[in-house]
Amino acid sequence: GVNLCSTIDELVLRLQQAMENERYPPGVELPDSVQFTDSLVDALDGASGIVVAVPTRGLRSIIKACQEFHGEKTPYLITCKGFEVGSGLLPFQIIEELSPKARYAILSGPSFAKDVGERKPTMVSLASSEESSSEVFSSLLLRGDVRTYYNRDLIGVSVGGAGKNVIAIAAGISEALGFGASALA
């Protein structure tokens, strides 16, 4: 099963009641195997992997909290993109700074959470300096509609993922303004 943790009590309650995150992405029903909690200790109990799905600005505090309760033995899957404000570090560099022995993989597209939730064919990169960390999450993500590819290029995957997000936002604005396919290209 999956333990989903949030420190926002109201969000945990809404998720339990609706069995979907009405904001990220809306309309995607969560499976019954997902358990919701506001306790990081409970969420990490027995975990074979820790998926960290927070904005980059929150990554440092989440990793510190996970270390306090779980140590370095369980690998992290990092989904955030971009650079940390102030330090300019990429997400994997934040982990390496805080916990040099930590195992981790970086998840990047090209993909959108909504497509994964709607079971549309999706390919993702799992970047890690050691393939075994990527393999843990590759097996957890394995579905007929999701394909994972291992990559050792942590900087390329991290910067590429951040750049893709900027382009995706610009493309969405272009589409919303009705600029057509030429502007999108």
Question: Language-model features: where?
Answer:
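Cofactor-binding loop segments of dinucleotide-utilizing enzymes, especially the Rossmann-like FAD-
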Residues: 7, 79-81, 129
